[in-house]
């Protein structure tokens, strides 16, 4: 399960207004994160049926839940499977523990479940609330990679970790994006590992948190993809939305750190429907619909579809932290669509 997020505040100037109202989803670029932190959620088999009936072709789960993995058998749904932060130390310290984890949670299902990525840790930094896990991320990634390779799955399943915008020391303008000094020694070896193994970097990208952290300088239309014209001119790059700016700042940081060939997969992005500033059903609907439409075309810095996972499938009434954390769902626990988004 994704932990409570502390998002960096990104200062950007904004202009304009336009609303995009219709959407179709690129089946190869959109997934939805499935969190289970609620006491009123459907069964795993019901959830898989809901994905299939809505044409959602990819899923992220935050731990190797056996009911979910079993329900995924034969579904053709592609999967990001997380190694929870609490498991990092054991998998980093003992290669046999990593091999057992991979055998039990991946190999045993791999003939019928379409694993795409293993996310070894979520939003871990050497500073902040998850700092105690930082030293274990790369060793755990290496041990999981070794186990995946031993199973002959290295071409099918890529090992990565899920980061977020807090790794950036500078993010504006996007071309000046760079990793903060206290993060560089942590992230640079991870970048080298990803490059060596042909794996993407997973990144949770949230314009919502950037906007709510600095509403004096960031306008809502820029965060919602509804600005009518160029908001940020960054050399030859023109930005009409904050999502692109955040993602390209991370790409710029990767380039400066020797990871210019790495792909970024957006492993989470969403907007809450209640519980905080600008958290309304209308804003969330606008964000999700426009995001789905937008990621088919790339960013100013990187062309091509952006593989993206929406956060999240359901409202989760047992999430901790900010009240907004409970209200990111695309569906209610009763399996009703909150936004009437077409997935076909």
UniProtKB/Swiss-Prot annotation:
InterPro entries: Glyco_hydro_17, Glyco_hydro_17_plant, Glycoside_hydrolase_SF
EC numbers on record: 3.2.1.39
UniProt keyword list: Glycosidase, Hydrolase, Pathogenesis-related protein, Plant defense, Signal
Highest taxon in the source lineage: Eukaryota
Gene Ontology MF term list: glucan endo-1,3-beta-D-glucosidase activity
GO biological process assignments: carbohydrate metabolic process; defense response
N-terminal signal peptide: 1-27
Catalysed reactions, semicolon-separated: Hydrolysis of (1->3)-beta-D-glucosidic linkages in (1->3)-beta-D-glucans
Active site positions: 123 (proton donor), 268 (nucleophile)
Similarity remark: Belongs to the glycosyl hydrolase 17 family.
Function description: Implicated in the defense of plants against pathogens.
Protein name: Glucan endo-1,3-beta-glucosidase
Organism: Vitis vinifera
Taxonomic placement: Eukaryota, Viridiplantae, Streptophyta, Embryophyta, Tracheophyta
């Amino acid at each position: 399960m994704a932990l409570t997020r502390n998002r960096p505040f990104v200062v950007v100037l904004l202009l304009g207004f336009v609303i995009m109202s219709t959407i179709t989803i690129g089946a190869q670029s959109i997934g939805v994160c499935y969190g289970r932190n609620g006491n009123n959620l459907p069964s795993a088999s019901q959830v898989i049926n809901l994905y299939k009936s809505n044409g959602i072709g990819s899923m992220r789960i935050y731990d190797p839940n056996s009911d979910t993995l079993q329900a995924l058998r034969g579904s053709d749904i592609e999967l990001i499977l997380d190694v929870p932060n609490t498991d990092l130390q054991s998998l980093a310290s003992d290669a046999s523990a990593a091999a057992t984890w991979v055998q039990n949670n991946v190999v045993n299902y791999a003939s019928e479940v379409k694993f795409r990525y293993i996310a070894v840790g979520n939003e871990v930094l050497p500073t902040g609330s998850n700092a105690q896990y930082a030293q274990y991320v790369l060793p755990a990634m290496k041990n999981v990679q070794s186990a995946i390779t031993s199973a002959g799955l290295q071409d099918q399943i890529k090992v990565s970790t899920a980061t977020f915008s807090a790794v950036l020391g500078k993010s504006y303008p996007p071309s000046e994006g760079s990793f903060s000094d206290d993060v560089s020694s942590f992230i640079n070896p991870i970048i080298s590992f990803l490059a060596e193994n042909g794996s993407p970097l997973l990144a949770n990208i949230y314009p919502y948190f950037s906007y709510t952290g600095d509403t004096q300088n960031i306008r809502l239309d820029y965060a919602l993809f509804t600005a009518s014209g160029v908001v940020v001119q960054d050399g030859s790059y023109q930005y009409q939305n904050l999502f692109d700016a955040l993602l390209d700042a991370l790409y710029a940081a990767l380039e400066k750190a020797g990871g210019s060939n790495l792909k970024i997969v957006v492993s989470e992005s969403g907007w809450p429907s209640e519980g905080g500033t600008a958290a309304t059903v209308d804003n969330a609907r606008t964000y999700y619909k426009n995001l789905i439409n937008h990621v088919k075309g790339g960013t100013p810095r990187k062309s091509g579809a952006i593989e993206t996972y929406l956060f999240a499938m359901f409202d989760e009434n047992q999430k901790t932290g900010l009240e907004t954390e409970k209200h990111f769902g695309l569906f209610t626990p009763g399996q009703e669509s909150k936004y009437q988004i077409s997935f076909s």
